[in-house]
C-alpha cells in the first residue's frame, strides 16, 4: 500500500481474447502515477477506479450502458472514482458502439458522458487534464464546453488518430457556429 492506494493488474484479457492489440494502458498505472496525479490536480475522476485501492470516496460516477446485453462480454456499467465531496451520480447513456459506426479505440466513451461530467463539476476557467486520452472524446467535450484541456496518450497510434479526429471535429463545429452566427445575423436584418 502506497499513498493510501495499492495497484493491481487490470485489463488486457478481453483484448487478447478477441485478437486486439494490448498496449501499455492495459496494465495498471504504477504508484508514482497516482502520486503525481494527486499532486498536480485539485480534483480527480478516475475511470476504472474500482480496480484500484484508492482512498474512500462519497462520489462514484456510474455510467450505465443500457444497450449492452447481459450475455455480452463487455461490462454493462463503468465506475469512476471521484474525489469530489458529492453523492454518487448515475447516468444511463448508450455506449458509442452503434451498428455500422467506425470506432478505433476499444474503451471509447461517448462525448455525451463527458458533457454530463463537465456540466456537473466544471466551471468557466477550469482546466481538464486527461492522462488517458484514448479516442479523444473528453477533448471534444471540453472544446464544446469552452474548457482548457491538456491530454496525454501512451500509444502513438491512438494519439495521432485522436488528434486527426479532433481537428476534423473542431473544424466541423466551427463551421456550424459560423453558420449559426450568419443565420442569426440574417434574422436580425429581417427584423
Segment roles from a protein language model:
Residues 1-191:
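Class I S-adenosyl-L-methionine
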Amino acid at each position: 500500500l502506497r499513498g493510501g492506494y495499492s495497484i493491481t493488474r487490470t485489463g488486457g484479457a478481453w483484448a487478447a481474447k478477441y485478437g486486439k492489440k494490448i498496449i501499455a494502458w492495459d496494465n495498471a498505472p504504477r504508484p508514482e502515477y497516482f502520486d503525481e496525479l494527486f499532486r498536480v490536480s485539485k480534483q480527480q475522476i478516475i475511470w476504472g477506479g474500482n480496480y484500484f485501492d484508492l482512498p474512500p470516496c462519497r462520489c462514484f460516477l456510474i455510467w450505465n450502458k443500457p444497450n449492452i446485453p447481459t450475455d455480452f462480454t463487455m461490462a454493462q456499467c463503468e465506475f469512476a472514482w471521484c474525489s469530489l465531496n458529492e453523492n454518487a451520480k448515475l447516468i444511463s447513456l448508450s455506449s458509442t458502439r452503434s451498428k455500422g459506426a467506425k470506432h478505433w479505440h476499444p474503451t471509447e466513451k461517448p462525448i455525451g458522458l463527458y458533457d454530463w461530467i463537465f456540466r456537473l463539476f466544471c466551471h468557466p476557467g477550469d482546466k481538464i487534464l486527461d492522462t488517458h486520452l484514448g479516442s479523444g472524446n473528453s477533448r471534444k467535450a471540453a472544446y464544446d464546453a469552452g474548457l482548457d484541456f491538456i491530454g496525454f496518450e501512451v500509444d502513438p497510434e491512438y494519439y495521432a488518430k485522436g488528434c486527426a479526429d479532433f481537428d476534423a471535429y473542431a473544424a466541423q463545429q466551427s463551421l456550424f457556429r459560423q453558420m449559426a452566427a450568419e443565420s442569426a445575423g440574417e434574422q436580425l436584418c429581417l427584423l
